[in-house]
Amino acid sequence: MPKWHWPIDPDAVPRILVEPPGPRALEVVRRDGEVIMQSFSRWYPLVVARGYGPVVEDVDGNLYIDYNAGIAVANVGHAHPKVVEAIKRQAELFLHYSLTDFYYEVAVKLAERLIAIAPISGRKKVFFTNSGTESIEGVLKIARGYFKGQRPYVIAFLGAFHGRTYGSMSLTASKPVHRRHFSPMVPNVIHAPFPHPVHCPFKAETPEECGEYALAFLEDWIFRRLVDPSEVALVLMEPVQGEGGYVVPPRNFVQGLRKMTYEHGILFAVDEVQTGFGRTGRWFAVEHFGVEPDLIATAKAIAAGLPLGAIIGRAEVMSLPRGAHANTFGGNPVAAAAALASLEVIEEEGLLNHAETLGEELKKLFRDEVGHRHDVRGLGLMIGIELLEGKKPAKYLEDVLLKAFKRGVAVIGAGLSTVRIAPPLVIPRDMAFKAAEIILDVLRGH
């Protein structure tokens, strides 16, 4: 069970002293608009001053239950003392010395730890990055490089989100705004249908049947009519689609997809940027499906909030020649120290089991209360409530999120109409249920 390490009473949260956004928050928002490029959307004007585990405090003194973990980053909570101490110790030694030009032990230790937990058999190697999108760019480059340019095609999925830099953006297909005005994309990327449990692109009766149709589409239409599988280097998927709406594919689809890649000699990579490091009750979400990937892309929760990512893969595949791929900051020593401490916290405090158990309880609560109207899905503490009007996405997601925020729950959305629930894994059960009841009360108003 997670421990409480922070100097506030968890029973006193949420606490709204000033109706949000308060005057100090509004002033920061005003200044932000004057100096920061507004190429992204904020869900509501939450201006964070401090974090306490699964709680954030705004600049006006309001306390919120953090139901998004900084977009699934703060798995061990905000300012976990073990992580903070590790950062301090490393910062007193040295802050930077480029790993791709020199050596330091803390990065080696982290690579060894990642190799130990990665669900890939045999020898593995790691490449460190600075973010999720950079990890995806690296996976794309590694896969094409492995085949020496002889397999130029890559298959991704409709509904996927892999990032906003050019390679990852070309693989992304969750919202048109991510790609509009930026063509041409990186060439030779093909998007295949993904088996959505509610919005199946085929006339399927069950998620499993939808999965079978999606596999058949790959074989019968893409491989027989569009591109020969011998020209495909990589199939990339999210074990749970994140920005696409917290969509969990059926097990038969993932297993069939892995079998297909084996048969055609195609590399199989999973984007675990949002799902990794305990979020779904496993170290990696792909473990739920009983398959092994060739490559895993990670970032977000790996270093408890510091910018770090990692690609973990079979040693044979992680074989680009010297000089072919490098960066300046990947594997930064302070971020690596934070990551090692974060992985220790996940293990020592039993956060994998806590995420799985609490996630099942929350899903049951949501299904019992609103499952007759909305679709509740997810793995562990990665839960989506897709708001529906009949079978169509509802149009009041933003109103639900804003009302929850004003009542002290910092929850965000995904997809077209999905409430995205991804609290820090250290959240106590009572606090998680308190936030859930607030969200349910807001939903009852619709």
Predicted regions located by residue number:
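Conserved N-terminal phosphate-binding loop of PLP-dependent enzymes in the Aspartate aminotransferase
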Residues: 2-446
